């Protein structure tokens, strides 16, 4: 899984789980077709739609110098009905 960094569980991301949509951050150089191929190959699901947007980096101050973090890309992946992605981590007991 070279392009997918991690799953995102924000308020909107949790709400979209009910619509069989999964949110994850991916590398900014990855294309939609690459991400679709990786998701279908790794999880064994069928992807019907993909939406993406680029999020800006945040400003970071290091003494008198103002720097910034890198921007990143977020993908919203819609799966066919009947398919789902299992949780990435189990809850500790």
Swiss-Prot record:
GO terms for cellular component: chloroplast; ribonucleoprotein complex; ribosome. It is found in: Plastid, Chloroplast. GO terms for molecular function: rRNA binding; structural constituent of ribosome. The keyword Ribonucleoprotein applies. It comes from the Eukaryota. GO terms for biological process: translation. InterPro entries: Nucleotide-bd_a/b_plait_sf (IPR012677), Ribosomal_uL23-like (IPR013025), Ribosomal_uL23/eL15/eS24_sf (IPR012678), Ribosomal_uL23_CS (IPR001014). Disulfide bonds: none annotated. Keywords: Chloroplast, Plastid, Ribonucleoprotein, Ribosomal protein, RNA-binding, rRNA-binding. Part of the 50S ribosomal subunit. Binds to 23S rRNA. Belongs to the universal ribosomal protein uL23 family. This is Large ribosomal subunit protein uL23cz/uL23cy.
